Amino acid sequence: MATAYHNLSDYDFNSVPNAENMRFGIVVSEWNNNITGPLLEGAISTLKKHGAKDKNILVQTVPGSFELTFGSAQMIKSGKVDAVIAIGCVVRGDTPHFDYVCAGTTQGIAQLNAEGDIPVIYGLITTNTMQQAEDRAGGRLGNKGDECAITAIKMLDFKEKLQKTQIF
């Protein structure tokens, strides 16, 4: 989706379907909340801009990014959502912890997508510096939360269109 120095909030508003009848779950990491907070705000704002109702947006927090997979799985099992947006931020440090958390979270979310009927949108920012994270959480490169919300809407629209398609 995003490329180097691409503004994550730039998109054609009219290309995004109406989300009025869609239900969204957002699982957000408490760790690095100075980043995940603005990402969450961006996602919610964008969902609402495209017709999502407050009552159809369920937000739950988890302690860290590694827990996003479990939180997303539980949200899916609840039956209360049509799509899940997983939001987190991991900034590289001096130990291999960054690599383990990023790989585990990425693999977990990929597995949920491969095995399930509910799209789980990957909103994990993985950066080398806090400045890079800030740039992607409402800074000079836009807000990845916007991008995640749009992706969730488009994936639900994709799923709905596919279910209605008849091939003979």
Swiss-Prot record:
One of its GO terms (molecular function) is 6,7-dimethyl-8-ribityllumazine synthase activity. Keywords: Riboflavin biosynthesis, Transferase. InterPro entries: LS, LS/RS, LS/RS_sf. GO terms for biological process: riboflavin biosynthetic process. The keyword Transferase applies. Its EC number is 2.5.1.78. Gene3D superfamilies: Lumazine/riboflavin synthase. Pathway: Cofactor biosynthesis; riboflavin biosynthesis; riboflavin from 2-hydroxy-3-oxobutyl phosphate and 5-amino-6-(D-ribitylamino)uracil: step 1/2. The active site is at H97. This is 6,7-dimethyl-8-ribityllumazine synthase. It comes from Phocaeicola vulgatus (strain ATCC 8482 / DSM 1447 / JCM 5826 / CCUG 4940 / NBRC 14291 / NCTC 11154). The gene is ribH.
